[in-house]
Amino acid sequence: MTPLLTLILVVLMGLPLAQALDCHVCAYNGDNCFNPMRCPAMVAYCMTTRTYYTPTRMKVSKSCVPRCFETVYDGYSKHASTTSCCQYDLCNGAGLATPATLALAPILLATLWGLL
């Protein structure tokens, strides 16, 4: 083997192989859900969506997605919703950060006001 070919093979062997992302995938009426799964190869993000029907009733959905569109509130439905994405194994296991929940307080109050 030529020295150049040997060098190329050594460099290629040192490169990390692309691995599928592991995400929690579930839908749960409550605070959180955990169900680790291996995502398809073309998936780049783990996504968590929380839909608030009332301040005390929500649905949590977690999935593998190829693209991410993070939202705080879509503005068209009567339910408040948050979506967050991340890009490392099982990163969507924890709940959304407290500041995001606090940011939803005015939306939740407006939703409640509209229901009355």
Swiss-Prot record:
Keywords: Cell membrane, Cell projection, Disulfide bond, Endoplasmic reticulum, Glycoprotein, GPI-anchor, Lipoprotein, Membrane, Signal. It is found in: Cell membrane; Cell projection, Dendrite; Endoplasmic reticulum. A lipid is attached at N92 (GPI-anchor amidated asparagine). The keyword Lipoprotein applies. SUPFAM superfamilies: Snake toxin-like. One of its GO terms (biological process) is regulation of neurotransmitter receptor activity. Residues 93-116 form a propeptide. SMART domains: LU (SM00134). Residues 21-105 form the UPAR/Ly6 domain. GO terms for cellular component: dendrite; endoplasmic reticulum; plasma membrane; side of membrane; synapse. Residues 1-20 form the signal peptide. GO terms for molecular function: acetylcholine receptor binding; acetylcholine receptor inhibitor activity; acetylcholine receptor regulator activity; ion channel inhibitor activity. Disulfide bonds join C23-C46, C26-C33, C39-C64, C68-C85, C86-C91. It is a lipid-anchor; GPI-anchor. Gene3D superfamilies: CD59. CDD domains: TFP_LU_ECD_LYNX1. Pfam families: Toxin_TOLIP (PF00087). The keyword ATP-binding does not apply. InterPro entries: Ly-6/neurotoxin-like_GPI-ap (IPR051110), LY6_UPA_recep-like (IPR016054), Snake_toxin-like_sf (IPR045860), Toxin/TOLIP (IPR035076). Acts in different tissues through interaction to nicotinic acetylcholine receptors (nAChRs). The proposed role as modulator of nAChR activity seems to be dependent on the nAChR subtype and stoichiometry, and to involve an effect on nAChR trafficking and its cell surface expression, and on single channel properties of the nAChR inserted in the plasma membrane. Modulates functional properties of nicotinic acetylcholine receptors (nAChRs) to prevent excessive excitation, and hence neurodegeneration. Interacts with nAChRs containing alpha-4:beta-2 (CHRNA4:CHRNB2) and alpha-7 (CHRNA7) subunits. Interacts with CHRNA4 probably in the endoplasmic reticulum prior to nAChR pentameric assembly. Interacts with KCNA2/Potassium voltage-gated channel subfamily A member 2. This is Ly-6/neurotoxin-like protein 1.
